[in-house]
Every structure is written in C-alpha cells, then in structure tokens.
Amino acid sequence: METATLIAISISGLLVSFTGYALYTAFGQPSQQLRDPFEEHGD
C-alpha cells in the first residue's frame, strides 16, 4: 500500500474511535457520573 493510503486509513480510524468513545461517554454508563449545572441551579 502507499504511504498516503495508510496515513488516511490511520487518521480515519482514530477519528472513528474518538467519536465512538465520546458517544459512549455522553450516553453510555459513564454519563451517570456527569453533573448537569442547569439542574443544580433550578429557579
């Protein structure tokens, strides 16, 4: 394979991995530990 192809595949894989981790953190099991500042400051 060419170097440019390997670099493009690597960057794409990293981007997909980061997006998956961000979605898991936002909506998965760790999301229960996140605090909501709007809920804490109820008027």
Curated annotation (Swiss-Prot):
GO terms for cellular component: chloroplast thylakoid membrane. The chain crosses the membrane at residues 5-27. GO terms for biological process: photosynthesis. It is found in: Plastid, Chloroplast thylakoid membrane. The keyword Membrane applies. It holds the Pfam family PsbN. Its main location: plastid. InterPro entries: PSII_PsbN. It comes from the Eukaryota. Keywords: Chloroplast, Membrane, Plastid, Thylakoid, Transmembrane, Transmembrane helix. May play a role in photosystem I and II biogenesis. Belongs to the PsbN family. This is Protein PsbN. The lineage of its organism: Eukaryota, Viridiplantae, Streptophyta, Embryophyta, Tracheophyta.
